[in-house]
Amino acid sequence: EDLTGRKLVSTKGTTPLKAVEQANRERLMGLTIVEAPDHARALEMVEKGEADAFLMDDVLLFGLAANRPDPKALKVVGRFLTTEPLAIMLPKNDVAFKKVVDEEMRRLITSRDIYDIYDKWFLRPIPPKGTALNMPVSYLLRDSWKYPTDHVPF
């Protein structure tokens, strides 16, 4: 809603691009939506003032911003436009391996070790450049850790 009448860019062929096009049609937001061939060009368009905002998955935006010469010149804002479950793919008939993965994921979550792992990779400086993404845990991820399961809730 805050973007009504603005010019947005997103990367060609991505889910966020499809979602914003649909939202624009359904909510009559009057957005100008531009497709960029890749993330680098979309980010460049925002930095050069050719677009007001770059719509993309939050983790990608945090990563792109963190690697700019002045990361504080960009800010990731707003609510989720889409939610897309991510998963671990295992060999279909390897029951023993699935059990190991399930048990370890459950242990990481119930012991709260998952928070330290998250902090290590998303809040603290990481290799190779020692850049921090500064990406806080989303409410959706935090809620998913309350009830560990191997079922996708969608």
Task: Label the model's feature ranges.
Residues 1-154:
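Proline/Glycine/Serine-rich low-complexity intrinsically disordered segments
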